[in-house]
């Protein structure tokens, strides 16, 4: 569907980065330095408070000085130019797969970036032309030309197109990659922005079509009218031709919510079904309300389901939910955590107390649901089994629910890319660590699967193999991980190894084909490990819940267990072991550097959280309390202080020299965590690398050239720390 294409276009590229090491030996631990990191951001007693001013002159002078120092040190390595060129060649390759998305009337859309189109092209072709292998594209929007004309670095972030024709789209453009964006109405048929069309100024906002002349807008209508997480919670109706100050309020959440908004439920044909409203009570609990009588009726119905249940679609009159906790219906039926359930929505709204779902799919202890999508007549689930994928097609009829497995590659990572709401076709990508991405088109009704194209191999994988192993964590839990290394790897403890993980927010880490990793690291003798630690979504909600709040040390223990297993197997050893992670994974890296400095010789800390005492007062941090806990709660706050990297740097400890990476335009986590941690290291006389991309948002890069530069810096760092010492 076109709306799906636009909403998912700008998936952040997987970040692969590293840092420089200090001495691996553990020395005598002294008392923690008194750095006042627990002070509020405006506290004058904090010697690093000036770094809170994102674009402040003093802060940016500090940033620019460290950027220059880091680039100067790493780019002098004679390998740097080659690595940057190799990375850019891979990222801009013209023979890579143009990721397709179904549009209306048999058309295929794609968003494309290369050396000429740095910010990108939104373009379209026919299905017949696309599958020919030499598609003839028509440009819909040239983001580079728009950026040049307006003096901006526009990052295209998708949008929302009005069904059934999908000609009118509300396009989101971000200046430099921030979460905040501007919204403009665009006419695809004419290839231009609508004159005097809908326009919303920059903000963290959401917008939904009601009809051709009406939209729902949720934004910060008056200064300060946002939740404690910094998101809007008031929705107003905006009519065509109205100014924003003429908009009429239709819905208001609560300031304590993470976010809230009024929306619209449509069927697969794009027809209006009813209004909905959403309140994010916290990151994992929501109140979803339905308005059976439509707009402007304010009578709402909240179904008696757990607030952890996730609404996953509307299919043939059935509401599809994913249960994240056990639930007992009014009849006493127990529905278990992880199940996909369905029930007649209109019947449920007429008599909410009598909701009695059917179970579509109940994962076993080794499985989890990775995603759902719909075609014209089928519901499709992506399922993980021991971190490998399968795809099943479901149908609902007089006999209830039935399903079959699509004949896609085994032991691969399968990604549901786009589905067609005018047929039963869907695009599926298949890939593995050593298997380049292959695009399939599957028919969810007949089960027919057609290979469309594959990415050429970008590195020599002939002598490599990928294996899955299991480590035993501190509490006895078995934790899986993948290891990619040479088939003839010498188990002598000297193999340079990068260990990556995320471990949070129920996000699973799966094998994927990273051409940059392969070319710059694996092909040159490096090994790579991916840890499926608790906190992620590899084995469903329970695997995630096991690492929440004060149980989060389990996540960190799991990661350490994988590292120790690699060392015990003599795959690697501390002088040759580096770790990397971004965002929540950046917090993971910070914790590992502080808790076990004796295990690592390199640590890459990307767009991280690091101050866990003050994170709720930084950027969107308040929205993550359901994951991490509240610093204001006595028990949770004490735990957060005990694991907060910023609060546990100690004098007299030989830490590995870290590589901190962030972005000035990151308005989700923000650059302050990384800035102040690096400044703390600086104040203590500890060595570190620091690089802050001026553009890029939470993805830390706004275009392919910036990604290539970042990769080159990271891998030079890794080579110097892990390979050059062999």
UniProtKB/Swiss-Prot annotation:
Which terms are listed as keywords in the entry? Hydrolase, Plasmid, Protease, Serine protease
- The EC designation for this entry is 3.4.21.-
- Show the GO cellular component annotation of the record: cytosol
Q: Which leading EC class covers this enzyme?
A: hydrolase
**One function term, GO molecular function aspect:** oligopeptidase activity
What is the superkingdom listed in this entry's lineage?
Bacteria
Q: Which residues form the active site?
A: 583, 698
Q: Name one GO biological process term.
A: proteolysis
PANTHER family xref list: PROLYL ENDOPEPTIDASE (PTHR42881:SF13)
Family under the similarity heading: Belongs to the peptidase S9B family.
Write the protein's name: Uncharacterized peptidase y4nA
Q: Which organism is it from?
A: Sinorhizobium fredii (strain NBRC 101917 / NGR234)
- Lineage, opening ranks: Bacteria, Pseudomonadati, Pseudomonadota, Alphaproteobacteria, Hyphomicrobiales
